[in-house]
Amino acid sequence: MQVSVETTQGLERRLTITVPAESIDSQVKSRLQQLAKTQRINGFRPGKVPVSVIKKRYGQAVRQEIAGEAMQRNFYEAIVQEKITPAGMPNFEMKTDVDGQDLEFVAAFEVYPEVEVKDVEKIEVEKPVVEITDADLETMMETLRKQHATWKEVKRKSKKDDRVTVDFVGTIDGEEFEGGKAENFELEMGKDRMIPGFEKPIVGAKAGEEVVADVTFPEDYHAEALKGKEAQFKITVNKVEGLSLPKVDEEFAKLFGVEDGDVEALNAEVRKNMQRELEQTLKANVKEQVIEGLLANNEIDLPKALVDQEINALREQAKQRFSQQQGGNVDNLPELPADLFQENARKRVSIGLLLGEIIKTEELKVDSAKVDALIETAASAYEDPQEVIEYYKTNDELMQQMQNVALEEQAVEVLLSKANVKEVNKAFDEIMNKQA
């Protein structure tokens, strides 16, 4: 086998491979002889068909089959010989395939770039230092109360955050219009669910009162006939309801799994959950800064094949998410354009190559304790964490994913140890609200 390597452009390579004629011809002859023993052809006894007859009937197909196998086999032998690592599958082009002549073909493909991670010490990282205060805990408890609040009818004027039940009739130039009328319509105030100006006269009204709202439909309103039109709504308030927050007591504590209803135990559990979420957010915050700094200081050539693979993966993930949210078969969804995923795909490929180089140069090995910690963190969000942990540990694919995540985190820790890190005091809500 003769091999010549050509760099065509950037990461693109062309291997021209020549396989001796005798190698191909002998394989073709052997394959034809095997066929002669098994093929049934009229006029010949089984196993007694002359090779010349088999060659006439099957020779071209057999040669194509042998040539295809030879291209695959010799390509992989060639890249081992030349110490080349392809990024993606090759495209084969046959140059010469004639009986008695050498088989010559070209394999075009991309290679991985040479990656040298530099300027790690120039990565700037602000590491937030956060303490969960009693005030933070009180705010979280208030949030939990609001999540379990109920609507109760009140005998007072309505306020911005109330829920009102109304009848309304809309008119344009004194004439009612389609879709402008409703009875016992529940409206949660302050959510901007109605057109601008509709809620304004309702604020301050009591049940049984009638008010009038003068409005103008937006130019981008979904109903073509109403765009930009001035209208008047006569609104009758039937009921006003305010949010009733539950007391933080024994019953409230039981809602969150505290069986004995101990409020102090609830506070401790809520603080523990806040701490866990905070630690995850801080880790993600620091990791993002490290990655962004790494990318900013290390621009590398990317194999198109890897970017295309990542685009396809992102496209498939988007289709699956859409299907889960909206329902329906993903096969019926239109093909999403590659441009939607190009930037994110390039970023992900760059991160993978750079962190891969860190893992290689630092000779990092998977830290089993870190893998266990990652699994426990993932499982803690479920009702039965131990069951989830067991599921992970008996699923090879999930375990491989967690090992990859652990290695990536170890690489980030190496970068962080060399980066320019400055600790900055931050408030809990500042960090968590930024995440949201």
UniProtKB/Swiss-Prot annotation:
GO-annotated biological processes = 'de novo' cotranslational protein folding; cell division; chaperone-mediated protein folding; protein transport; protein unfolding
Domain PPIase FKBP-type: start-end pairs: 161-246
One Gene Ontology molecular-function label: protein folding chaperone
Q: Name one GO cellular component term.
A: cytoplasm
Q: What class of enzyme is it?
A: isomerase
Where does the UniProt annotation locate this protein?
Cytoplasm
**EC number of this enzyme:** 5.2.1.8
Pfam families from the entry?
Answer: FKBP_C, Trigger_C, Trigger_N
**Classification via InterPro entries:** PPIase_dom_sf, PPIase_FKBP_dom, Trig_fac, Trigger_fac_C, Trigger_fac_C_sf, Trigger_fac_ribosome-bd_bac, Trigger_fac_ribosome-bd_sf, Trigger_fact/SurA_dom_sf
Catalysed reaction(s) here are: [protein]-peptidylproline (omega=180) = [protein]-peptidylproline (omega=0)
Top-rank taxon, per record = Bacteria
> What keywords sit in the KW lines?
Cell cycle, Cell division, Chaperone, Cytoplasm, Isomerase, Rotamase
SUPFAM superfamilies in UniProt: FKBP-like, Triger factor/SurA peptide-binding domain-like, Trigger factor ribosome-binding domain
Q: Which NCBIfam families match?
A: tig
| Role description | Involved in protein export. Acts as a chaperone by maintaining the newly synthesized protein in an open conformation. Functions as a peptidyl-prolyl cis-trans isomerase.
| PANTHER family, per the entry | TRIGGER FACTOR CHAPERONE AND PEPTIDYL-PROLYL CIS/TRANS ISOMERASE, TRIGGER FACTOR-LIKE PROTEIN TIG, CHLOROPLASTIC
Its UniProt domain note says: Consists of 3 domains; the N-terminus binds the ribosome, the middle domain has PPIase activity, while the C-terminus has intrinsic chaperone activity on its own.
The Swiss-Prot or TrEMBL record describes its family as follows: Belongs to the FKBP-type PPIase family. Tig subfamily.
Task: Write the protein's name.
Answer: Trigger factor
